[in-house]
Amino acid sequence: MNITQIIEKLKQNEVVAYPTEAVFGLGCNPFSQSAVEKLLILKQRPREKGLILVAPKLDYFFSFIDKEQINSQHWQKLQQTYPRPITWIVPAKKDIAKFLCGNFNSIAIRVSQHPAIKILCEQTGFALTSTSANLSGIAPCKTSDEVRLQFGADFPVLDMSVGSAAKPSEIRDLFTNQLVRQG
């Protein structure tokens, strides 16, 4: 599908596949519980685990993160450009939907300059959920054709290329810098 068709699907609270820095991601509107529920069912992902949000700028995350707990040093860390994609675990707002953060009082966010993510967020006005596009036990998809093989020929997938990162993002705690997932 082209970018316009994918944007329409996202606005209709559908789940789509889109390229990220290393692999294809499954994403939807994080403000829509029905969209997130569809994503969790499709991915067979336990709700307790929470989800990653991805966007081209920090502003897209302000509805989800507790900004008061983040000091200027941590803001700099979030805004910095890194040689590889990094997802940061940050404090979530107290009223954040549990379907996004699972059993945690935090949420994982990643600022991405991938052109697909930039266009999708700018055109929809929201960050995207981001979980790797693959069924349980199968490697994440690196091409739109692989997505169609796993999820069906009619699955809405954006026909663009993934970035040059060799592996999906590493995940780190913003405050402790502890590595949660190796990238």
UniProtKB/Swiss-Prot annotation:
Keywords of the record: ATP-binding, Cytoplasm, Nucleotide-binding, Nucleotidyltransferase, Transferase, tRNA processing
Cellular localization per UniProt: Cytoplasm
Top EC class, one word: transferase
Name of the gene encoding the protein in the UniProt record: tsaC
Residue intervals of the YrdC-like domain: 1-183
Job of this protein: Required for the formation of a threonylcarbamoyl group on adenosine at position 37 (t(6)A37) in tRNAs that read codons beginning with adenine. Catalyzes the conversion of L-threonine, HCO(3)(-)/CO(2) and ATP to give threonylcarbamoyl-AMP (TC-AMP) as the acyladenylate intermediate, with the release of diphosphate.
Primary localisation category: cytoplasm
UniProt-listed Enzyme Commission number(s): 2.7.7.87
Gene Ontology biological process terms, A to Z: regulation of translational fidelity; tRNA threonylcarbamoyladenosine modification
One term of GO molecular function: double-stranded RNA binding
Catalytic activity from the UniProt record: L-threonine + hydrogencarbonate + ATP = L-threonylcarbamoyladenylate + diphosphate + H2O
High-level lineage: Bacteria, Pseudomonadati, Pseudomonadota, Gammaproteobacteria, Pasteurellales
UniProt-listed PANTHER family: SUA5 (PTHR17490), THREONYLCARBAMOYL-AMP SYNTHASE (PTHR17490:SF18)
UniProt name for this protein: Threonylcarbamoyl-AMP synthase
Protein family according to the UniProt entry: Belongs to the SUA5 family. TsaC subfamily.
One GO CC annotation: cytoplasm
Organism from which the protein derives: Histophilus somni (strain 129Pt)
